[in-house]
Amino acid sequence: MWTKPAYTDLRIGFEVTMYFASR
């Protein structure tokens, strides 16, 4: 299921966004 690079990129972007939002 998790073989789409777009999904990985989106997840990384989401992680970074949440990280900055948490700060």
UniProtKB/Swiss-Prot annotation:
InterPro entries: PQQ_synth_PqqA. The keyword Ribonucleoprotein does not apply. Pfam families: PqqA. Signal peptide: none annotated. One of its GO terms (biological process) is pyrroloquinoline quinone biosynthetic process. Coiled coil: none annotated. There is a cross-link at residues 15-19 (Pyrroloquinoline quinone (Glu-Tyr)). The keyword Ribonucleoprotein does not apply. Pathway: Cofactor biosynthesis; pyrroloquinoline quinone biosynthesis. Keywords: PQQ biosynthesis. HAMAP family: PQQ_syn_PqqA. Belongs to the PqqA family. Required for coenzyme pyrroloquinoline quinone (PQQ) biosynthesis. PQQ is probably formed by cross-linking a specific glutamate to a specific tyrosine residue and excising these residues from the peptide. This is Coenzyme PQQ synthesis protein A. It comes from Pseudomonas putida (strain W619).
